Design a protein with these regions (language model features):
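Transmembrane alpha-helical segments in multi-pass inner-membrane proteins
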Residues: 224, 238-300
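Transmembrane helix-bundle core of multi-pass membrane transporters
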Residues: 124, 128-186, 212-215, 234-243, ...
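Hydrophobic alpha-helical transmembrane segments
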Residues: 21-26, 51, 59, 80-84, ...
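Single transmembrane alpha-helix segments in multi-pass membrane proteins
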Residues: 30-41, 45-96, 120-124, 254-268, ...
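Cytosolic-side transmembrane-helix boundaries in multi-pass membrane proteins
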Residues: 1-33, 37, 177-179, 197, ...
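Alpha-helical transmembrane segments of multi-pass integral membrane proteins
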Residues: 30, 35, 39, 161-195, ...
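Alpha-helical transmembrane segments within multi-pass membrane transporters and channels
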Residues: 96-137, 273-278
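Interfacial loop-to-helix junctions that mark the boundaries of transmembrane helices
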Residues: 13-21, 45-53, 97-101, 157-169, ...
Length: 320
């Protein structure tokens, strides 16, 4: 894509990306205030660190899901990729590869599996939801082969660094968002939005649609695998099914953050805020004494509302 074509797309993409963010920020702030009232300990360094450690993996998988939703796709393999990342970390870091080698193995697995999935979707023109559903079974099977039951080893110093009493998780999240901002300034990064918003128009403008899709899947796999590594650091071991809840939670967080299913609508900031809102909602309902079943019902109703209200408002404005 040429610089001129990139510039011509930028204004429209920016406007579409930022719709509804102010309302989201207000809702998130209100929930954070309520949470601070119910649990004043979050205002301490230790409390804030513990909260961000619990939120961080959800933020990563929300970003992983948002990457594909912005491109007009979706993945059902987020949870298995989290599990596989945790398993690879726990089975390699205590061996000859060491901590750094284990980290590289986790990152390489996420990138390669994501890129392979993206290539199948892009080059064979298959629906992403079907390919990732099949992939989720394969990835889950590989995780169980590598580690049939919870176990393995994660260095204590790594667990202390990532899941100790310092806000390292929050700093890592800020770093990742900064890197995303830099990536978004490139033609390939802008192409993720353009291809999701209007694939035909993007193709005519010179956007390499297939390459954009493959890169989106690769980065999504990387983020999900790194979330698994962080979870392994939290627990000190690996678990082949620990990522199961993350698939649906990643979709819920992205939707709460205003990321559209049809592509091109939403922001990574929104997805992260959606994950924060979901995390805070779960904690608030816990402190208010909601039973687990009631929490699931409340989460479902809130997510349906998050999707339905903007749609109804849009129709009302159109018919007014």
């Amino acid at each position: 894509m040429t610089l001129a074509a990139s510039s011509s797309l930028y204004g429209a993409v920016q406007r579409r990306r930022n719709r509804g963010l102010l309302g989201l920020y207000i809702v998130v702030t209100a929930f954070l205030i309520l949470y601070a009232v119910l649990f004043p300990g979050i205002l301490s360094v230790g409390g804030f660190s513990k909260f961000t450690q619990n939120w961080f993996p959800l933020a990563l998988v929300a970003m992983a899901q948002a990457l594909l939703m912005l491109n007009g796709g979706i993945t059902l393999a987020i949870g298995p990729m989290v599990s596989l990342g945790a398993v690879i970390a726990a089975t390699t870091m205590g061996g000859p590869l060491g901590t750094f080698g284990g980290f590289l193995a986790v990152a390489a697995a996420g990138l390669c599996i994501g890129a392979a999935t993206g290539a199948i979707v892009a080059l064979l023109r298959l629906p992403a939801i079907i390919v990732t559903l099949a992939g989720s079974f394969i990835i889950s099977g590989v995780a169980l082969i590598l580690l049939p039951r919870p176990g393995g080893f994660v260095p204590e110093w790594l667990s202390t660094l990532l899941a100790g009493h310092t806000p390292v998780a929050f700093l890592l999240l800020v770093l990742i968002l900064g890197l995303w901002k830099l990536f978004l300034a490139t033609p390939l990064g802008l192409g993720i939005y353009a291809a999701g918003d209007n694939p035909v128009g993007a193709y005519r403008s010179g956007v390499p649609i297939d390459r954009v899709k493959i890169v989106s899947f690769a980065l999504s796999g990387l983020l999900a695998a790194l979330a698994g590594l962080f979870v392994a650091a939290q627990t000190g071991s690996g678990d082949p099914i620990i990522g199961t809840p993350f698939t649906l939670n990643s979709i819920a967080a992205a939707v709460l953050g205003g990321v559209g299913f049809l592509g091109g609508k939403g922001t990574m900031r929104g997805a992260v805020c959606g994950s924060l809102l979901l995390s805070v909602m779960i904690n608030v309902m816990f402190f208010l004494g909601f039973s687990p079943v009631a929490q699931y019902v409340a989460q479902g109703l809130i997510i349906v509302g998050a999707v339905a209200v903007p749609e109804l408002l849009g129709r009302w404005r159109t018919n007014r």
